[in-house]
């Protein structure tokens, strides 16, 4: 008779290792502490995370919340056994959605679910989450690690993130004064970011390349490593530009659905965004995906960011000032288009020129 048979079944016999969970918590504590900021200086492990809005400097705040995941980009991380950066993606997808509304990210919580917990793997993931929190200035105040035998295939896991930010009342974006003739600025992306990876994986499968093969579009990198380049976090440069110039009218985070799905979300119904596709310096990864998969330009534009991770709407007279403010903070900024009148029933995004794939 087995030991468990003599003494009765244990949770471990069912596939849940509480000791592994406790070990992971100890491993991640230094990373979590590194995200402390005014308003959040507690320890993880309580029943809930705490945040003090007054200590963060707000007087009459409106809270803004967002949640998101990393999608099937995680499958590449799992197959390539490289888990250090997907946590950055998780934070980026949430906090970039906050800043487009003019909100400063304040705190973040994560949900990490797996069939069999590997404390080292989990710690690598949370270290990435902490790095994203530091980069965006928000505190990692809690999370959930769920070990669920039978729910996931061996080695698989999923991530979800939850972020809360704030802006003073009356300072939310879009500002409500977007007008015909306003300029659209593009901010360069770092790569594919965290959308469209089911199509990416399909194209890689058709190519016959392994994740460990040299990346055809990135010298000196393996394919998996190059595709796992973390999503760019735009928070601090945008917040600084918002506060210093007071000239940003609207922002749009270019995620799933690309330009046609994301830009109209921040526009009034009588205006459309005219995008000059020739203005985009398309990163090599998108050219490779399009050519290898035979993906047409219109499909690329509604699936990927194609090199533009964020757009900014400003008046024509403020375009130079905002460009200089963002460039000074390390962003690559370029004129992308302008606001034009929209006819009844017309789409909110209009293209001119050709995408240089």
UniProtKB/Swiss-Prot annotation:
Biological pathway: Purine metabolism; IMP biosynthesis via de novo pathway; 5-amino-1-(5-phospho-D-ribosyl)imidazole from N(2)-formyl-N(1)-(5-phospho-D-ribosyl)glycinamide: step 2/2
GO molecular-function terms, A-Z: ATP binding; phosphoribosylamine-glycine ligase activity; phosphoribosylformylglycinamidine cyclo-ligase activity
Alphabetic keyword roster: ATP-binding, Cytoplasm, Ligase, Nucleotide-binding, Purine biosynthesis
InterPro entries: PurM-like_C_dom (IPR010918), PurM-like_C_sf (IPR036676), PurM-like_N (IPR016188), PurM-like_N_sf (IPR036921), PurM_cligase (IPR004733)
GO cellular component, one term: cytosol
Chief site of localization: cytoplasm
Catalysed conversion reaction: 2-formamido-N(1)-(5-O-phospho-beta-D-ribosyl)acetamidine + ATP = 5-amino-1-(5-phospho-beta-D-ribosyl)imidazole + ADP + phosphate + H(+)
Signal peptide: none
Keyword Ligase: yes
Biological process (GO), any one: adenine biosynthetic process
Top-level class of the enzyme under EC nomenclature: ligase
Entries under SUPFAM superfamilies matching the protein: PurM C-terminal domain-like (SSF56042), PurM N-terminal domain-like (SSF55326)
Superkingdom of this protein's organism: Bacteria
Subcellular location: Cytoplasm
EC number, as in UniProt: 6.3.3.1
Keyword presence, Cytoplasm: yes
NCBIfam families associated with the record: purM (TIGR00878)
Protein family: Belongs to the AIR synthase family.
Protein name: Phosphoribosylformylglycinamidine cyclo-ligase
Organism for this UniProt entry: Agrobacterium fabrum (strain C58 / ATCC 33970)
Gene: purM
